[in-house]
Amino acid sequence: MWRLKVSEGGSPWLRSVNNLLGRQVWEFDPDLGTPEERADVEKARREFAEHRFERKHSSDLLMRMQFAKENCQKLDLLAVKRGEHEDVMGEAVWSSLKRAISRVCNLQAHDGHWPGDYAGLMFFLPGLIITLHVSGVLNTVLSSEHQKEMRRYIYNHQNEDGGWGLHIEGHSTMLGSSLNYVALRLLGEGPNGGDGCIENGRNWILDHGGATFTTSWGKFWLSVLGVFDWSGNNPVPPELLLLPYQLPFHPGRMSSYIRMVFIPMSYIYGKRFVGPVTPVVLELRSELYNDPYDEIDWNKARTQCAKEDMYYPRSSKLDMFWSFLHKFIEPVLLRWPGRKLREKALATSMRNVHYEDECTRYICFGGVPKALNILACWIEDPSSEAFKCHIARVYDYLWIAEDGMKMQIYDGSQVWDAGLTVEALVATDLVKELGPTLKRAHSFLKNSQLLDNCPRDFNRWYRHISKGGWTFTTADDGWQVSDCTATALKACLLLSRISPEIVGEPLEIDAQYDAVNCLMSLMNDNGGFSAFELVRSNTWLEHINPTEAFGRVMIEYPYVECTSSSIQCLALFKKLHPGHRKEEVENCISKGANFIESSQRSDGSWYGSWGICFTYATWFAVTGLVSAGRTLGNSATVRKACDFLLSKQLPSGGWGESYLSCHDEVYTNLKGNRPHGTHTAWAMIALIDAGQAERDPVPLHRAAKALLNLQLEDGEFPQQEIVGVFLQTAMISYSQYRNIFPIMALTGYRRRVLLAGNI
C-alpha cells in the first residue's frame, strides 16, 4: 500500500531552509495494510474507473483512508450546543458545521498543514516521463509501482473519444493526446495495450492530422524524445537573455512563469538535444503520423496546430516573424562565428537555471519548469550534483489518489490551504475546542515564512524581494506570492487575537512588518497587486504569445484576487497596528479598492484569473471592497456585484459555474444547472459580507439549504467539478476547497443571518 509521509526526507541531496516542513511524499510499502484496508483501496479504484466519464475528479480517498487510521482521535463537538435563539434551521446549520469541522481537523497533517491533490493538468506528467526516459533514470527514479499508478492515471483520464485533454475535464487535444500516448508507451505499454485504449488514442491522433498538429510545447517534448525533428519547431533563442533589459521583450520583463519555462527550454533548444533513439522511439515515429517519418515536411509542421488546441491563434505577421528567425537567424547562430554567440547565450541560460535551482532548493517554479530544469542540468553534466539534487525533489510533485499517480502543478498548496483553513476555523465559535488544530497550523505558518531575499544580487536574476513573504507551497520553494503572503499573514493576525495558551505565541512583530513590506512592494501604480512580481512590460507582448494553448501568459498582470487578499490583510493589520506606516498602508488599501472598482465588468462581475471564474473573482472583489469600507448601502459597485450574483442563483438555491467561463469569458452554468458546493459558498460569503441579509435574506436561506443538502454523511462536502485555473485554459484541482469554503459560508450565515435575527 501507499503511505503519505509529511515533512520527512532522508536523501543527502535534499536541500531545505526549515527541515523540509510541509514536504509531502508518497512511498510504497508492500507490507503495509490489512487485507480489509487493501480491499477498500481496490474498491475505491474500481469505483472511480467505472464512473470516470461522469466523475472526472478523485475524492483523494487514499489519503483520507490513511488519516482516518492515523488521526483516529475524534474531535467531539456534539456537546457544543446551538445558540439560545436558534430555530430548527439554526440547529441544522450548527450540526452541519460541527460535522464538517470535525472532519477537517482529522484531515490535518501532524506538521500543521492540510495535504491534498493539487493536479488536474494532463501535460505535466508526460514531460517528466520524457525527461527521466532520455536521461536514462526512468526505472531508477520510478519504481514499478510508481509506473503502474501513472499508467492507471493516464488511462482513467482518457476521454471517451480516445484522446486526452489539456486537463482532466477538457475536450481532447493534440497536446494532451500525443504526450499521454507517448507517456504510456515509455511506461511499458505496447502499441496494442490497455484493452484497446492505446489503439483508441493512436486513432484519435491520426484522425486529427497526426502529431505534427500538436502545440509548440508538444513539439518541443516530442523533439527531445526524438520523435519530432527540431526543424519543425519555432525558434526558442537563448540569445534573448543577452539583449538589453530595457527592451520590453527581454525575458526578465516577461511573466515569471513564462520566463522560468523559456530559460531552460531555450537551453535545450539551443543544444538541439535529442535523447537516445531506442526501439520504442523508432516505433513511435511510425505510430504518431499519417506520413512516413522521413517524408514529413517539418517546415510546414512548424506552423501546424489542431483547432482543438488553438486558444490563442497566431497572426500571419507572427508566423512571418518565426519564419524569419527559423530560416535566416538560426542558421547563422549554428555556425561559426555566430556559434560563439550561441555558446555565450547557452552559458547565460544555465547560470539562470542554477540560480533558480538554488533559490527553490531544486523544487522549481512548477511542474513544467521542474522537468525542464532537470533535463537542462543533465544535458550540461549527467553526473552533476545539480542533477542529483533535482532527482531527490521529483517525488515532491507526485500525488496518488484512487485515480492513480499524477504530477501536481506545484509541490502542493500547503501555505495557501493552511491560511484559508485557519480563517475558516477562527470564524467559528469553537476556538477553544479547536485549539490543538489551530496551534499546529499557526506553527506551520510561522515557520513557513521566508526569512531572506534570494541570495546575492537577486535583481540581476530578475527576482523580486521575498523577505517576509510566504509562498504558495513551502518555504523551500522560495517564490513569494502576494495573495499567499496576505492570506498567511491574515491568518497569523487573526490568531494573534486569541490567547497564546490556546493557539501559541503570535508571529513576531518584526516578521509581521517584513510581511507587510513584501506585500506592499507588489502593488503596481494602478493600485492592482500582481502575484509574483510587478508588471514589467506591455500587454502588446501577448501578440507574440508562442504557446497557442494559453492566454494572458507573456507578462505579469495585476489581479483582482491578489488585490482583494492584500487589502483585506492590510485592513486587519491597520486595525491591530494603526501606527505602522500608516499613510502607506492606507494608500495601498485605497488604491487597491479603486483598482477593483475600475476592473468591474458591465454586468457587475469580475473575471477570475486563479479560480472559476466570475463567481470566484466577484467573491474576492466584494470581500475586498467591504474591507475597504464599501457595502451594499454606500457602493453602487457592490450593489451591482450582488445583483450579478443573485442573477446567477440556480432554482436549487446554489451556484455552479463551468470552467468554460474561463475559456470563453462568458458566465456558463455547469451541465444540467447543477449546484456546486464551492461556488455556492463563494457567492454566499460575498453576499453576506456585502449586507444582503439586511436587504433580503431569502436568497441566503435558499443557498444555505443547498449547501446542507450537498453535505455527505461523514461531514465532508463532495468533490465536484474543477475550481482552479491559470493562464485562462489550464484548469487545476484544489481538493481542500470542498470543505474550507462551505464552512466559511455556513459560519457567516449562522452568525450574521440567523443569530443576527435576519430571518
Swiss-Prot record:
It is found in: Membrane. The active site is at 483 (proton donor). Pfam families: SQHop_cyclase_C, SQHop_cyclase_N. Keywords: Isomerase, Membrane, Repeat, Transmembrane, Transmembrane helix. Its main location: membrane. NCBIfam families: squalene_cyclas. This is Parkeol synthase. It comes from Oryza sativa subsp. japonica (Rice). The lineage of its organism: Eukaryota, Viridiplantae, Streptophyta, Embryophyta, Tracheophyta.
